Curated annotation (Swiss-Prot):
Short sequence motif 'HIGH' region: positions: 39-48
Binding site for L-tyrosine: Y34, Y168, Q172
Record InterPro entries: aa-tRNA-synth_I_CS (IPR001412), aa-tRNA-synth_Ic (IPR002305), Rossmann-like_a/b/a_fold (IPR014729), S4_RNA-bd (IPR002942), S4_RNA-bd_sf (IPR036986), SYY-like_C (IPR054608), Tyr-tRNA-ligase (IPR002307), Tyr-tRNA-ligase_bac-type (IPR024088)
GO biological process: tyrosyl-tRNA aminoacylation
Name the UniProt record assigns to this protein: Tyrosine--tRNA ligase 2
Family from the record: Belongs to the class-I aminoacyl-tRNA synthetase family. TyrS type 1 subfamily.
Localisation per UniProt entry: Cytoplasm
CDD domains: S4, TyrRS_core
Taxonomy, superkingdom: Bacteria
Source species taxonomy: Bacteria, Bacillati, Bacillota, Bacilli, Bacillales
Annotated Gene3D superfamilies: HUPs (3.40.50.620), RNA-binding S4 domain (3.10.290.10), Tyrosyl-Transfer RNA Synthetase (1.10.240.10)
Enzyme Commission number(s) from the entry: 6.1.1.1
Subunit structure: Homodimer.
Organism: Bacillus thuringiensis subsp. konkukian (strain 97-27)
Length: 419
């Protein structure tokens, strides 16, 4: 199947400006296409991945992706999908975010080779345009009536929208025009909320370059979970690509915990597995759901893609240790990842009796309860049961002098940081 057929099979196409024309174009030649992201933060989350996974598929099919980091538009604020004005960021913060997002993109895409990925920053071609040029050369080509009719603006008319955010669609249209004339970009990809901005770009190109210009837009559906909620959030909030914000273990666990009703859809959306392999896994979901093979494959594919093979192996190791209770096999760094969301306590490195220590930390409510739990075999330290109420807790019990793991009962883990 060609790239458009594959995208449609994967359920990744929402709207196209000219399906027949785009299909014919990609069958005739390899094209350049672009997708942009504004540096509103210093990391993307998994919701941002959706259009860039499509870009990656085009790249693997031999087409040339152009990734735009919005160093200019990021200082303005995209009103799409928002009910209120964005808080403007300083140029210094925007530049910091640009650098961080650029580094993330370089990890996700291969640079060099037959299908080289280009990174561009729209600040480079917009910062020297003065207000007169903006109004004469670009603003003249936009009708206020059509701008007001765009969903991204119409939805804000009751609550209010600033002139700054109102003109965002002009800036994004300028991006498409610039990339069309300078990089021969013929296709823009975006989320479903970007349809109005994308069509503004098509209109501008045709007005400035002629109606025969072959340019296209394609949007991706809003991805919802089976319960109707928006994809991309965990119980702890957004799932980030930055390992400092969401550890590779947490990232892996997010995908492992995918609902059976969603997992096949996610395999199509996010992985590069073949149709045959995904069909096999879909059968396993129906016939052997308890094995969660599809979820494990999804988690492995996504963790390796975003964080690399080594981080995947570490996440799998932590998962296995937590399931089996074999905590001693983990390193201190792995403990830090695996127990990040567990109840955490702080302790000195001073040697203490286990009973006194558990009560002082607040893990046990009283000495009597602590002794009772120890005598009943309900307390484990670093994966080994504590059977003697006279046991001393020393720094030698810790992982690299940093952590001690206490388990009370079967599942109640606590992380104790020494310092």
């Amino acid at each position: 199947m060609n790239i458009i057929d594959e995208l449609e099979w994967r359920g990744a196409v929402n709207q196209q400006t000219d399906e027949e024309g785009l299909r014919k174009l990609v069958e005739e030649k390899k094209i350049s296409l672009y997708c942009g992201v504004d540096p509103t933060g210093d990391s993307m989350h998994i919701g941002h991945l959706i259009p860039f996974m499509m870009m990656k598929r085009f790249q693997l099919a031999g087409h040339q992706p152009v990734i735009l980091i919005g160093g200019a538009t990021g200082t303005i604020g995209d009103p799409s999908g928002r009910q209120s004005e964005r808080q403007l960021q300083t140029l210094e913060v925007v530049q910091h975010n640009v650098d961080a997002l650029t580094a993330q993109m370089k990890k996700l895409f291969d640079f060099g080779g037959n299908s080289e990925v280009k990174m561009v920053n729209n600040y480079d071609w917009t910062h020297e345009i003065n207000i007169i040029e903006f109004l004469r050369d670009y603003g003249k080509n936009f009708s206020i009536n059509s701008m007001l009719a765009k969903d991204i603006v119409a939805s804000r008319l009751d609550t209010g929208i600033s002139f700054t955010e109102f003109t965002y669609q002009i800036l994004q249209a300028m991006d498409f025009h610039h990339l069309y004339t300078k990089e021969d970009v013929q296709l823009q990809i975006g989320g479903s909320d970007q349809w109005g901005n994308i069509t503004s770009g098509l209109d501008l190109i045709r007005k400035l370059e002629g109606h025969e210009a072959k340019v296209f837009g394609l949007t991706i559906p809003l991805l919802l979970k089976s319960d109707g909620t928006k994809f991309g959030k965990s119980a702890g909030g957004a799932v980030w690509l930055d390992p400092e914000k969401t550890t590779p273990f947490e990232f892996y666990q997010f995908w492992v915990n995918t609902d059976d009703r969603d997992v096949v859809k996610y395999l199509k959306y996010f992985t590069f597995l073949t149709k045959e392999r995904i069909d096999e896994l879909a059968v396993k979901v129906e016939t052997e759901p308890h094995k969660r093979e599809a979820q494990k494959v999804l988690a492995e594919e996504m963790t390796k893609f975003v964080h690399g093979e080594e981080a995947l192996l570490q996440a799998v190791k932590i998962t296995a240790a937590l399931f089996s209770g074999d905590i001693k096999s983990l390193t201190a760094d792995e403990i830090e990842q695996g127990f990040k969301e567990m109840p955490t306590f702080q302790s000195s490195k001073e040697t203490k009796n286990i009973v006194e220590w558990l009560v002082d930390l607040g893990i046990e409510p009283s000495r009597r309860q602590a002794r009772e739990d120890i005598n009943n075999g309900a307390i484990s330290m670093n994966g080994e049961k504590v059977t003697d109420v006279g046991t001393d807790v020393t720094v030698e019990n810790s992982f690299d002098g940093r952590f001690i793991i206490i388990r009370k009962g079967k599942k109640n883990y606590s992380l104790v940081k020494l310092g």
